[in-house]
Amino acid sequence: MASIQANKRLTKEYKNIVNNPPPFIIAAPHEDNILEWHYVITGPPSTPYENGQYHGTLTFPSDYPFNPPAIRMITPNGRFKENTRLCLSMSDYHPEAWNPAWSVVTILNGLLSFMTGDEQTTGSVSTSDKDKRTLAKKSKHFNTYSNFKFKNMFPDLRESNIKDIEREAALEAESKGAQQEENKAQKLATEKATSLDDISDPEDRVRIQELIKAEKDKKDQDKNPGENSNIKSLLCLILAIAIFFVGLIMK
């Protein structure tokens, strides 16, 4: 149970966060336990975590702010072990280094700074930037469909995630369909070229080429019916003039 001072301090800090949200960070206490806080860090630009969504917890001692919280990250991220206490200067691993003036925002900014660096500590892991980017892309899906605590703590954010995931899936399907059409067209062109190369008789090859050209011209005509009609009208006019002059000559 939180002490009166801890309750008062954490309530004040939550109000400050609501009124002045820090960049890349969302944080809120559990409605049934003010000592249990949940945070969401959005991966900053120009880092392997860009647009990733990382959920974790801060577990405060009852005598906060005189002692630091335990820090954990739940979402797979490639930097820290999931659901493992992290050894940081602002965590309960180092109470001797703790400053009571530090706040929730100070702690989470420090966590974000450490996360985007390369320093190792207890609870950290080593992975490639490629792995971190892959996990960043999967993070919203994990939080939305596999992270029970996230769903309970951040229902509005979960709904937003669902819309983002559906939109990305639709764009991916559209892109995949366009790529398949392009591949199909390239395959068809390759097959035509191959079939021409297989024809040994020059005259037969010329005839096939003419057929392919005729087919292409027909498609072009179908695409431009207005232009086609104008050409036919012009030809009819020229033919009529020619017949008129032939009639004059014959007289």
Curated annotation (Swiss-Prot):
Catalyses which reaction(s): S-ubiquitinyl-[E1 ubiquitin-activating enzyme]-L-cysteine + [E2 ubiquitin-conjugating enzyme]-L-cysteine = [E1 ubiquitin-activating enzyme]-L-cysteine + S-ubiquitinyl-[E2 ubiquitin-conjugating enzyme]-L-cysteine
PROSITE patterns: UBC_2
SMART domains per the UniProt record, alphabetical: UBCc (SM00212)
A Pfam family hit: UQ_con
Organism ancestry: Eukaryota, Fungi, Dikarya, Ascomycota, Saccharomycotina
Name of this protein: Ubiquitin-conjugating enzyme E2 6
Localization per Swiss-Prot or TrEMBL: Endoplasmic reticulum membrane
Keyword Transmembrane helix carried by entry: yes
